[in-house]
Amino acid sequence: MSKLIKGIAASDGVAIAKAYLLVEPDLTFDKNEKVTDVEGEVAKFNSAIEASKVELTKIRNNAEVQLGADKAAIFDAHLLVLDDPELIQPIQDKIKNENANAATALTDVTTQFVTIFESMDNEYMKERAADIRDVSKRVLSHILGVELPNPSMIDESVVIVGNDLTPSDTAQLNKEFVQGFATNIGGRTSHSAIMSRSLEIPAIVGTKSITQEVKQGDMIIVDGLNGDVIVNPTEDELIAYQDKRECYFADKKELQKLRDADTVTVDGVHAELAANIGTPNDLPGVIENGAQGIGLYRTEFLYMGRDQMPTEEEQFEAYKEVLEAMDGKRVVVRTLDIGGDKELSYLNLPEEMNPFLGYRAIRLCLAQQDIFRPQLRALLRASVYGKLNIMFPMVATINEFREAKAILLEEKENLKNEGHDISDDIELGIMVEIPATAALADVFAKEVDFFSIGTNDLIQYTLAADRMSERVSYLYQPYNPSILRLVKQVIEASHKEGKWTGMCGEMAGDETAIPLLLGLGLDEFSMSATSILKARRQINGLSKNEMTELANRAVDCATQEEVIELVNNYVK
């Protein structure tokens, strides 16, 4: 008899295969064992650190190729932990001063750090705790000579079942053999869920108990479309889901026909579908999925995974490569957005209790112009190789935009005096991520050339709900009428001044949000490249006039639930 387990649909698709349980390795050791060869034990610890660095670097590089630079950035954070003297030195001191064995010293010190970070009322610091825990486990495995589970070694078709998949687990999945995965914990915004969508592997998270209900080798079905796991399906269920899987693949093949099609509603209104990228390595997916431009080029990934700033020349080459590859299509480049959840070891940024509201993005760039100016110079030099737009992140006041623009114009003049050619057709815009910016959109619209709404931050700042916190995840509401009203206000302000508005947050590719955004008049939808064809088909089947009526009704709703019900009734 089959068993149904419900979870959260994290990545589309249907997987049918035997279960492969990720078994936790035995990392037990004698905590009380003292060592006599202190120097040898320190060397053993240092060797484990170096082995972990080599391992993580390989995983990071593999993740960048398979998933893109933005998804690989989590491993930059892990590598930073391994280089942090505030963590490493106390471990070495404990071995030397207390004759502790390396495993005990490692776990005692990292446990202290994890406890401190987890006790902070700050989700960013709690994420740091998770990084330290993951890295500590890897180092401990090298100290003890125990191999961690390595999904890359799987050589038969399986569905992976585990309590959770770490980023390194997910990055090592071989798509040829891993058909899907299901976990006890996690949500749609967890690292494993995000990576599974990039890999296009069906995934279900948050089942709570799947590791207790599935045995090694059980036949299971993962329905990533509905969030269902069927354990040991009946013959009829197997046939039904095989048909469902075939329909899913046929549908994906059908979508490919839209690669070179226009994005236009049934009543003739055009929309632009663009892609979000982190590095030039992401370009093949952009082109394969028929993106009409790049709506967000996250330049911070040029700065990560290294021990010094990228030079102006290195940046110029990267920007030039992207602009040339897009062959005249618009490329919107976001200037450096460091701080908050992204750190650089060589900048020595101060620790802040609430880094998401602190010294980051345009605030950092205006204060440290030795970082900002080389980037602007590289962008200006690259501008002659395509259609370049530049936008500044985390702008809260009109004075910040004016100061950033003044610096850019100053560097433009400097470059011309040096004999460089610079395009005269560069548009300057801002990210709208802060409610104050949305409230003053009419003021900004008189001076900027365009807006790009960053809904990921706008939602969490408006509703005061950290999107990475499970405790307040119910408040992270993309369809809340307050968010829709802010989006409407920004779009209307831009159109009144003859400007355009794009969106580059997760919401831009969301099938429930797309009808609303179309109705609100959004000009550009920028999303993960893998979402573009599905969004194109959806928009091509909608009426702009009807969606305008829908959006006008949605902004008058009182709750997110009312908005979702309204959309479901309109779009069937």
Curated annotation (Swiss-Prot):
CC cofactor: Mg(2+)
Domain notes: The N-terminal domain contains the HPr binding site, the central domain the pyrophosphate/phosphate carrier histidine, and the C-terminal domain the pyruvate binding site.
Cystine residue pairs: none
Compartments reported by the entry: Cytoplasm
Keywords for the protein's UniProt record, in alphabetical order: Cytoplasm, Kinase, Magnesium, Metal-binding, Phosphotransferase system, Sugar transport, Transferase, Transport
InterPro entries to which the protein is assigned, alphabetical: PEP-util_enz_mobile_dom (IPR008279), PEP-utilizing_PTS_enzyme (IPR050499), PEP_util_AS (IPR018274), PEP_util_C (IPR000121), PEP_util_CS (IPR023151), Phosphohistidine_dom_sf (IPR036637), PTS_EI (IPR024692), PTS_EI-like (IPR006318)
GO CC annotation: cytoplasm
Entry annotated with the keyword Metal-binding: yes
Catalytic activity: L-histidyl-[protein] + phosphoenolpyruvate = N(pros)-phospho-L-histidyl-[protein] + pyruvate
NCBIfam families to which the protein is assigned, alphabetical: PTS_I_fam (TIGR01417)
EC number(s) given by UniProt: 2.7.3.9
Enzyme class: transferase
Family: Belongs to the PEP-utilizing enzyme family.
Protein function: General (non sugar-specific) component of the phosphoenolpyruvate-dependent sugar phosphotransferase system (sugar PTS). This major carbohydrate active-transport system catalyzes the phosphorylation of incoming sugar substrates concomitantly with their translocation across the cell membrane. Enzyme I transfers the phosphoryl group from phosphoenolpyruvate (PEP) to the phosphoryl carrier protein (HPr).
Species, as recorded: Staphylococcus aureus (strain N315)
Positions of phosphoenolpyruvate binding: 298, 334, 456-457, 467
Protein name per UniProt: Phosphoenolpyruvate-protein phosphotransferase
